[in-house]
Amino acid sequence: MRIIAALILSTVACTCLAKQAAVENVRMWPAPDRTRIVFDINGPLEHTLFVLNNPARVVVDLRDTSLGVKVDRPTDADKLLQGIRHASRNHRDLRVVFDLRKPVRPRSFLLKPNKQYGYRLVVDLYDKGDVTKSLKETIKRSAPRSPSKLRDLIIAIDAGHGGEDPGTIGRKGTREKDVVLAIAKELKQQIQNTHGMRPVMVRRGDYYVGLRRRMKIAREHRADLFVSIHADSFKDPRVRGSSVYVLSRNGASSEAARWLAEQENAADLVGGVSLDDKDDLLASVLLDLSQTATLSASTDVGTNVLKQLGTTGKTHKRRVQRAGFMVLKSPDIPSILVETAFLSNPSEEKRLRNRAQQRKIAKAMVAGVKGYFKHNAPPGTRLAGRSHTITRGDTLGAIAGYYGVSLRDLRKANALKGSDIKIGQVLEIPTFSGG
């Protein structure tokens, strides 16, 4: 009888232990506006979160959970998180304490399994001061520009995926998030070296940015163009070539476009973005169908970029494709998504890993963008069609400096051999200096 009772108790104990969740990995992703901590767990769990002050801490209690992995220290670059401590409570629960460098606004949510990950508990720590700072910057950027001052074109560069979302992964282990960030940084450098243009990086490091947040960043900086950079993937490894996509109102233009849009738009599920931050104004704007002019401009700039990409290698389609990518839905900013090559193709995976090839791809994109804005620059920008009427005290050198063009190009545009100019003379200002 004692043996039977012992067996029953043993069985009950084993059953209870089997129900306990386990943390299998802890990942941290510091970003400019927050730090994200992701707990990879082997099943659903219940948790509570609360904040403590003096010193600033965030505490997360995970019910019926054990921790069987080593937790790394936060990096010195993390502006919010100083350290992580953990301990068992009641021999059943797990308490995790986040020691902070400054007060934060925490948020947590549980994510169900997807193709890449199992269950995950996500804890986001937002900088409390970031809200005020962001609001001030938005108001400042929204202020009317002085009509007498010429401005640079603003190009928003969006490196796809990031952080816990690696994007597609090639056979050699190449992660899309890494190669597109490398290309984006190269594109940024080349745009900085182009007269009349200024780059804005949507993602500057290895962290995830929500799809709608990417559009919002472009809008906050009043971008004239949004360029999202990706690496393609398809079930057939023989498929290769570059593609350029613009938004489709009526569905995707091909089977590959439909399949790809489903994969890319699912990134928010991988990245763990909740629906709390989708304000009504943005939602209504996204549903607005009055995008004819923007879609037309997107197609035109996309055509120019695709043509230039054809000089660096094979293009997958001869024409700009259309698909329902979330990041292309800004109603007032021309937007294109560039699939640089197929990571699912072994030879193109090798190409995307090559620094020289990354530079060529970026150079082709810049050439395509310049080709479009050469004839379509918005009024008030340095690249818009311009002329200058000579007044007393003007010199050719001073005019060239004011408009940011070289003296050589200014002379060439006006068929001038020397530096002699006359009051009342009208000079044409070249759109791009040196090209």
Indicate where each model-derived feature is located:
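Extracellular LysM carbohydrate-binding repeats and other cell-envelope/extracellular binding modules
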Residues: 386-392, 401, 406-435
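Signal-peptide-cleaved, periplasmic/extracellular N-terminal interaction regions immediately downstream
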Residues: 17-155, 398-401, 406-408
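Sec-dependent signal peptide recognition
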Residues: 1-10
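N-terminal signal peptide c-region/cleavage motif recognized by signal peptidases
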Residues: 13-15
